[in-house]
Swiss-Prot record:
Main EC class the enzyme belongs to: transferase
Biological role: Promotes RNA polymerase assembly. Latches the N- and C-terminal regions of the beta' subunit thereby facilitating its interaction with the beta and alpha subunits.
Species classification: Bacteria, Bacillati, Actinomycetota, Actinomycetes, Frankiales
Enzyme Commission number: 2.7.7.6
SUPFAM superfamilies to which the protein is assigned, alphabetical: RPB6/omega subunit-like
Protein name per UniProt: DNA-directed RNA polymerase subunit omega
Entries under Pfam families matching the protein: RNA_pol_Rpb6
Organism: Frankia alni (strain DSM 45986 / CECT 9034 / ACN14a)
C-alpha cells in the first residue's frame, strides 16, 4: 500500500517535549496554544465578513481541514510566537 502512510499532525506532531521548551509548564502551554487557536478560528470566521482584525496562520496550512489547535502548536514549535508571563500577585485592595 504505497502512499497510504499517515503523517501525524497536531497533538502527535510536533512532539510534546519540543513544545514544552517554549513554555514554563504544560499548563501554560495549554493556555498559550488555546489562546492562539481561538485567534486563528476568529480569523477564519471573519474572512467572510471582510474584517481583518485577527492575524491568520503563520505557518503554511496544506490541509484545509487542519484544526486551529494543530496550527497553533506548529506555530509554537516553529518559534513564530512570543508570550509574556504575567505576575500572579495582585495589588492590595483598599
Amino acid at each position: 500500500m504505497a502512499g497510504t502512510v499517515a503523517h501525524p499532525e497536531g497533538i502527535t506532531n510536533p512532539p510534546i517535549d519540543e513544545l514544552l521548551e517554549a513554555t514554563d509548564s504544560k499548563y501554560s502551554l495549554v493556555i498559550y496554544a488555546a489562546k492562539r487557536a481561538r485567534q486563528i478560528n476568529a480569523y477564519y470566521s471573519q474572512l467572510g465578513e471582510g474584517l481583518l482584525e485577527y492575524v491568520g496562520p503563520l505557518v503554511e496550512t496544506t490541509n484545509a481541514q487542519e484544526k486551529p489547535l494543530s496550527i497553533a502548536l506548529r506555530e509554537i514549535n516553529a518559534g513564530l510566537l512570543t508570550h509574556e508571563t504575567v505576575s500572579d500577585s495582585l495589588p492590595p485592595v483598599a
